[in-house]
Curated annotation (Swiss-Prot):
Catalyzes the conversion of 2,6-dihydroxypyridine into 2,3,6-trihydroxypyridine in the nicotine degradation pathway. One of its GO terms (molecular function) is protein homodimerization activity. Optimum pH is 8.0. Homodimer. The keyword Flavoprotein applies. Gene3D superfamilies: FAD/NAD(P)-binding domain. It catalyses: 2,6-dihydroxypyridine + NADH + O2 + H(+) = 2,3,6-trihydroxypyridine + NAD(+) + H2O. NCBIfam families: PRK07236.1. Optimum temperature is 20 degrees Celsius. This is 2,6-dihydroxypyridine 3-monooxygenase. Pathway: Alkaloid degradation; nicotine degradation. The lineage of its organism: Bacteria, Bacillati, Actinomycetota, Actinomycetes, Micrococcales.
């Protein structure tokens, strides 16, 4: 098998973009990554549940799972106001963080062909190449472009005009270091994934690795608020400069009124959850939104991950889906076969998986956000991707 001799550009340098670029480069493909951020990404240390697809590449490179994740033994379901235990099921999930996964991938890829401050503003293609134009006035050309630029994908918008649709709620995120809450609170959440159930929204909390392989883990939490689209959402997403932001308001940009409201609402929670909310040093808020496409292959431009199907986070496999898109697409390009036929097979399989996953997390949200029955251990709400067949490779024979 021989890889393509075409040059490939990856727009978006997060986890899926780096996974695709690394697998392509390892197979001898000429590949560059273009990232809109002015520096390598941080993800603010947010937590991720480990799925096989997410860590597949890192483990192949000899990275030890223990060095990038922490274990757990159960999933706990409690009333987030009273602390009443709703249920518990054994579970051996491992938890990691965005900075652990991204940092490992970025270190392997290196900075030489990872181009920062490259915000895509123009995209065109002909029968042989794709032309890209960036906001800094530079241009680039490749035989293929992989759009891996996330839920707010510029590539998808340029191709299809599709933007994410607000799901009706936001998530507040926070990460706590050892010592920022009392030991009893720390132990309450350690070694488990905890659902805090409410009639109007829900919380989750779980441990994640320390920064840069520090021995002591951190605690990660999310609190999902239902917020009506319109004035209420606009106020929440308007930063201290008076600018209405579309996706996230980071801690140093939060309007003080909104931060006070976050803390005020946190006062009503069961003590362990309350202490997470009140002691998080850098909470921030992000809208939850969906987007989907009917095609991932658009001539010489290909969409993967959240740039193709943007799911809600409730089944803990959005990153895994993105990495699976990246891995299977890289395999299409690095095998000697009918490329167009194999791309069609790849697209069919990945769309089937992406659409099934999106439907699953919407059903989970309909219960979690509105006080519906969320039975402990219900397999319909299990973490992970739907099972679909591997894409077939179409040969020329």
């Amino acid at each position: 098998m021989s890889p393509t001799t075409d040059r490939i550009a990856v727009v978006g340098g997060s986890i899926s973009g780096l996974t695709a670029a690394l697998m392509l480069r390892d197979a001898g493909v000429d590949v560059d990554v273009y990232e809109r951020s002015p520096q390598p990404l941080s993800g603010f240390g947010t937590g991720i549940v480990v799925q096989p697809e997410l860590v597949h590449y890192l483990l192949e490179q000899g990275v030890e799972l223990d060095s990038i994740s922490v274990p757990s033994s159960s999933m706990e379901y409690v009333d987030a106001l009273t602390g009443e235990r709703v249920g518990s099921v054994p579970a051996d999930w491992r938890f990691t963080s965005y900075d652990s996964i991204y940092g490992g991938l970025y270190e392997l890829f290196g900075p030489e062909r990872y181009h920062t401050s490259k915000c895509l503003v123009g995209l065109s293609q002909d029968s042989e190449t794709v032309q890209m134009r960036f906001s800094d006035g530079t241009k680039a050309e490749a035989n293929w472009v992989i759009g891996a630029d996330g839920g707010a994908s510029v590539v998808r918008k340029r191709l299809l005009g599709i933007e994410p649709t607000y799901a009706g709620y936001v998530t507040w995120r926070g990460v706590l270091q050892p010592g920022e809450v009392a030991d009893d609170v720390w132990n309450y959440f350690n070694d488990k994934f905890t659902y805090g159930l409410l009639d109007d929204g829900h919380l989750i909390a779980y441990p994640i690795p320390g920064r840069e392989n520090a021995e002591s883990p951190r605690l990660n939490f999310q609190w999902y608020w239902n917020v009506a689209e319109g004035p209420d959402l606009d106020e929440l997403m308007t930063d201290v400069r008076g600018i209405r932001l579309p996706t996230s308001v980071h801690n140093n940009s939060l309007n003080p009124h909104n931060l006070r409201q976050f803390h005020s609402k946190g006062e009503s929670l069961f003590k362990p959850f309350r202490d997470l909310v009140l002691n998080a040093s850098s909470p921030f808020v992000t809208v939850v939104a969906d987007a989907t496409v009917d095609r991932m292959v658009h001539g010489r431009v290909l969409l993967i991950g959240d740039a193709a199907v943007t799911p809600r986070p409730h089944a803990a496999a959005g990153g895994a889906k993105a990495c699976d898109d990246a891995r299977t697409l890289a395999e299409v390009f690095t095998k000697n076969h009918d490329l167009r036929g194999s791309l069609q097979s790849w697209e069919t399989r990945q769309l089937q998986q992406g659409h099934a996953y999106l439907n699953k997390v919407k059903k989970m949200a309909s219960r979690l956000q509105h006080g519906g029955s969320f039975e402990p251990g219900n397999p319909a709400f299990a973490f992970g991707l739907p099972k679909v067949d591997e894409p077939s490779v179409v040969t020329n024979s």
